[in-house]
């Protein structure tokens, strides 16, 4: 499937006895569609979703990596499961966001509406709207905190909202959307940034704005960006 200048890859896989489709969204774009049960899915740049063409009679299970946002169709007889990076999220009908990129140190599950239960090893974490489960892959264990859901899912609406975010977190988000490699100096990575990035604007526009509001310099050379 062609999406702009990028190739959206879809293929069949075999995770269980059922055949699964694998939808791979490349960098510099996102994708949305509705699954066979009516669940709406938004898939961010550099992300993958594995899902069956038709769900089983007793449950609905998908596998994800990267970042996805789901509005799960209600079905009391068939709970919906999302398996991602060692976490299994169970819902009946709700809206939530998952961020689990392989090259990032944290996996985040954020609930917007409804109620979900996230299973990590032998422990279950129940989330209510506005709560985020954060699992650090390197240091410490899972933790739950209060967040602004509008900020978390702003990427589905054509822009990114950053509120007091570390510049390293900003870079992690923008590198996937713009398809570039962003390297920050040790001093720049911990700078706190607040602002809105329109996904339609060029990367150079953001870099110029960043230089104006922060004490940093930016050097862009093709697909390589250095911030120091």
Role assignments for model-derived ranges:
Residues 1-228:
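A residue-level detector for the "anchor" residue at the start of short, highly conserved motifs
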């Amino acid at each position: 499937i062609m999406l702009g200048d990028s190739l959206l890859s879809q293929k069949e896989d075999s995770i269980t006895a059922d055949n699964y489709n694998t939808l791979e969204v490349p960098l510099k774009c996102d994708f949305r569609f509705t699954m066979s049960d009516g669940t709406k899915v938004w898939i961010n740049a550099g992300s993958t979703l594995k899902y069956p063409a038709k769900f089983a009679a007793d449950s609905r299970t998908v596998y994800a990596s990267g970042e996805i946002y789901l509005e799960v169709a209600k079905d009391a007889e068939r709970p919906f499961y999302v398996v991602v990076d060692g976490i299994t999220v169970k819902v009946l009908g709700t809206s939530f966001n998952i961020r689990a990129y392989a090259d990032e140190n944290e996996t985040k599950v954020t609930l917007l509406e409804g109620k979900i239960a996230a299973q990590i090893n032998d422990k279950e974490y129940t989330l209510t709207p506005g709560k985020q489960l954060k699992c650090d892959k390197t240091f410490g264990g899972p933790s739950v905190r209060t967040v602004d859901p509008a900020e978390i899912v702003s990427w589905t609406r054509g822009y990114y909202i950053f509120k007091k975010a570390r510049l390293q977190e900003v870079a992690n988000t923008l590198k996937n959307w713009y398809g570039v490699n962003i390297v920050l100096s040790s001093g720049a990575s911990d700078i706190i940034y607040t602002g809105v990035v329109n996904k339609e604007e060029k990367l150079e526009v953001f870099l110029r704005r960043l230089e104006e509001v922060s004490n940093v310099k930016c050097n862009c050379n093709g697909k390589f960006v250095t911030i120091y």
